């Protein structure tokens, strides 16, 4: 998501994030893994399930430290007042914009070269989240294994369906910190915040999935970005009928995280956009 901030002011309605205000202990998560059902055929976006096929239900308990959640949230985003720049001339403006660009990059925000626009630094968010989520990812993996999951694709499906199970809600472009300061987040949340809030949009849920998968070296992940939407690509061998792209000589199976979709299946309108080349790939280093 891209956020534009005017040079002199920023006037977006703010809502406060309070997911770490309550004491967190062991959180229980229950979800269905659609990858375990047997699809007889797809007709457009509708799956016709083979008679007698069932969907595996997964449950796990996860412990999250409130201090870690608070630290993750506070590390991400920049004060809105930073985006109000006073300058003498164009040279002074360019200098101050570069300084802002460098400061923002240390808080997970990219300032674009064209104009005063800000986007999420997906690499920064994932790289600053894997350590916090490794125990969560191991818990999900162990839960799946107890249910008979063995292959890498099956385990990826367990983690993807976990992220998909979070309620779909769009975060605001800003949050308010404990001091009442407006913080620009470009409409995304840190994965720990998404986890404890139990909701997020395509960006935040994809960041949660990528961070979980990367934390246990389960699979390489990239992001596919198109107009007002984002989904993930995973570097595994495509199965028959999987939706996939080829990027830098590798096959990437597509994963829709905003809603419950099986690995390798995305909405048909998104496939048409892919075929027409209306997307870009964000590699996660």
Enumerate the language-model features and the residues they cover.
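Bacterial N-terminal signal peptides that target proteins for export
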Residues: 1-8
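Bacterial N-terminal signal peptides
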Residues: 9-16
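A structural boundary/capping signal
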Residues: 19-285
